[in-house]
A protein has these predicted regions:
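Acidic-leaning, charged glycine-interspersed low-complexity segments
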Residues: 21-24, 91-139
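Oligomerization/assembly interface segments of phage tail-like spikes and tubes
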Residues: 60-77, 125-136
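Sterically constrained small-residue positions within well-ordered secondary structures
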Residues: 36, 61, 118-122
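Residue-level signal for secondary-structure boundary sites
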Residues: 53, 78, 137-139
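Small/polar-rich, solvent-exposed N-terminal microdomains that initiate assembly or binding
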Residues: 1-60, 81, 97-103
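Mid-chain, well-packed structural core segment of small domains
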Residues: 73-94
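Short, surface-exposed linear patches
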Residues: 50-52, 65-69, 90-96
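Short capping loops/turns at secondary-structure boundaries
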Residues: 3, 83, 120-124
Length: 139
C-alpha cells in the first residue's frame, strides 16, 4: 500500500510543478491512454516499486524502495531544444535527499536524477529520467 502513497506524492508534485510553469506541460501517469496533439511535448511518469524490506526481528519496520521514472516525450526530429530544459527543471524538482510527506508518510529521494539515453521512433523522441526513492515506517 505504501508504494501507492509514494506514487501519489510524486504525482501531486509533478502536477503542481506543471501548473506553476509559464507553459504547463501535460503529465500522463500509468495506465492512462493519451493522444498528444501534433507537435506536443508531454511527460509520462512511472512507478517502479522494488523490494519492501524489514530490518527488525519484530517485523514492525518496513522500507519501501524503488525507482520513479519520468519520461519526456517530444516530437521526432525536434532535436533536444524541448527536452534539455525539461531535464534541468525536473532535476531541480526532484533534489537529492528531498523529503516529501503525505499524511505522516515521508519518502526520500535517494539518488540524483539520472538521464537515460534518448529513444527515437517514427513519431517521438523520448528522454527517460529516473531516481531511487526510499520510505521507512515503523520502528
Amino acid at each position: 500500500m505504501s508504494h501507492a502513497i509514494i506514487a501519489s506524492i510524486y504525482e501531486a508534485k509533478l502536477i503542481a510543478w506543471s501548473k506553476a510553469r509559464t507553459e504547463p506541460i501535460k503529465v500522463v501517469f500509468e495506465n492512462v491512454k493519451y493522444e498528444p496533439a501534433d507537435g506536443e511535448t508531454y511527460l509520462r511518469a512511472f512507478m517502479l516499486p522494488g523490494e519492501t524490506a524489514s530490518s527488525t526481528l519484530a517485523g514492525d519496520h518496513r522500507a519501501f524502495i524503488g525507482v520513479y521514472q519520468v519520461s519526456i516525450v517530444a516530437p521526432a526530429n525536434s532535436g533536444k531544444t524541448k527536452t534539455n530544459p525539461l531535464v534541468v527543471e525536473l532535476t531541480a524538482l526532484f533534489r537529492l535527499y528531498a523529503r516529501d510527506t503525505k499524511s505522516g508518510f515521508t519518502v526520500v529521494t535517494m539518488s540524483p536524477v539520472e538521464q537515460g539515453p534518448g529513444i527515437t521512433d517514427a513519431a517521438t523522441y523520448m528522454v527517460p529520467l529516473s531516481f531511487q526513492y526510499r520510505a521507512d515506517t515503523g520502528s
